[in-house]
Structures are given as structure tokens and as C-alpha cells.
Design a protein with these regions (language model features):
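Glycine-rich phosphate/ribose-binding loops and adjacent secondary-structure elements
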Residues: 133-227
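Non-catalytic, usually N-terminal nucleic-acid engagement modules in DNA/RNA processing proteins
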Residues: 1-130
Length: 227
């Protein structure tokens, strides 16, 4: 069997996996059938991270009508709630639905960093309002194309991770995107800022998007051991 999330049946197995809403069956009932190897996994043995589809937004695969992005009860809200409930049904840890700052470099209809940040905060507000605490743990995604914009992004979204502000609905971990995932000066700088803000306390997952090479594994392990 190629069911690599099942150590008893798979030809090989992994204890961790990542699955994106951008490629999934978002109807939980249908997903339970067609993606049973994911949904029926032994959750005591396998940890699954759910990607919200932000990368697909950046590449123009997951399209939003930006002029109606904030319309209450509109089609964008329908997409948001489908992704939110799929993540809660599927994943142990989940990305919020960010609009990556590098989206402006592709054919997405987005032109400015400000738009990406504004729309991400709108999605964060939606997830914060409609999430079921405990169904999945959310990772607050950090983006930014340079130090200045990375600081702007962090300052705008850090409150979503603060239990003093949002109580049990505060996001439980962090995900590093944009320059935060590859520029080591910025990574260390951000870790210090997060530490000083008390926003690494009781955060059990720090995810680096798009990072899989061996050198990064060594460097990130060193950081982890010193946090």
C-alpha cells in the first residue's frame, strides 16, 4: 500500500505530513471518502499540517474577486468558510489564509504590499470570528519582501497571536514566509522581536514555509535548541 500515513499498511511511513486546501476536496463528507488515508489516519501517531492555499493565491490559481473581497456573506466568505472548516476537520496545525506579499509579482490582480497585508488581516479577522477553538491549531503567517515590509507585516498581525487580546482564539503558532523563511539575518532578528514581545511563549510550532534543504535543517535545529 502507498498509504504512507499508516505505519502498518504503507510500504513506507511518515509521522508528519502537509496537505494543502489548494489541492484538497473541501467538502468534509466527500473528503472522508475520497481522502480517507488523510482523514482516517491515526492522529496519535501522525501530525498533519494543513496549508490554507495561500501559495495558490500568490500564483493566481486560487482567485478572489478583489473588488468584492470584503463583501459580507459573499462568494469570498463562502471560500473562506470552506477552507476554515476543512482545516479544522483535517489538520492538527493549520496556516491562516494569508495573501503572500510576493503575490504582487504574479498575475493575481494584486499590485501593492499594502493590499496583501490588508487582505490577510481581513482573513485573520474572519478566522478569528468563526474558528472553533481546539479543532485545529492555527499558525500566524509572517510575510514581507524586505526588512521594512517584514516589520510592517509583523506589527500588523502579531496581536492575533496574543491571548491577552484574543483569549482562547489566539493563534497558537507561527509560520515564516517571504524573506522570513530564507534571510537568516531577518530570521534571527524576528526571533528576538518575538521573544521580547512574549509571543514565543506557549507557541509549540514554528513552521518555515518552502524550506527543505539540508543546510536550513542544520541552522533551524541550532535555533530551535536555543529558543
Amino acid at each position: 500500500s502507498m498509504d504512507f500515513l499508516n505505519e502498518d499498511k504503507g510500504l513506507f511511513s511518515y509521522k508528519w505530513g502537509l496537505y494543502s486546501a489548494g489541492h484538497a476536496v473541501l467538502d468534509p463528507v466527500k473528503s472522508d471518502i475520497s481522502e480517507a488515508h488523510v482523514q482516517k489516519r491515526d492522529r496519535s501517531k501522525v501530525t498533519l499540517v494543513g496549508d490554507s492555499g495561500g501559495f495558490q493565491v500568490a500564483k493566481g490559481v486560487l482567485k478572489f474577486p478583489w473588488d468584492k473581497f470584503k463583501e459580507p456573506g459573499g462568494k469570498c466568505d463562502e471560500v473562506r468558510i470552506k477552507i476554515l472548516k476543512w482545516l479544522e476537520h483535517t489538520a492538527d496545525w493549520s496556516m491562516i489564509l494569508d495573501v503572500p506579499s510576493f503575490s504582487i509579482h504574479f498575475d493575481t490582480g494584486l499590485k501593492t504590499f499594502k493590499e496583501c497585508l490588508e487582505y490577510t488581516c481581513h482573513n485573520n479577522d474572519f478566522f478569528m470570528e468563526w474558528r472553533t477553538p481546539g479543532a485545529t491549531k492555527f499558525l500566524n503567517v509572517l510575510q514581507g519582501n524586505d526588512l521594512r515590509t517584514a516589520d510592517q507585516w509583523y506589527d500588523a498581525v502579531k496581536g492575533y497571536s496574543d491571548p491577552k487580546i484574543h483569549g482562547e482564539k489566539a493563534f497558537e503558532g507561527w509560520a515564516m514566509g517571504g524573506e522570513n523563511m530564507r534571510w537568516w539575518y531577518l530570521i534571527l532578528y524576528r526571533m528576538i522581536k518575538m521573544r521580547d514581545d512574549g509571543l514565543l511563549e506557549n507557541k509549540d510550532w514554528l513552521h518555515f514555509l518552502g524550506t527543505s534543504h539540508l543546510q536550513a535543517a542544520i541552522q533551524l535545529t541550532a535555533i530551535k535548541r536555543n529558543l
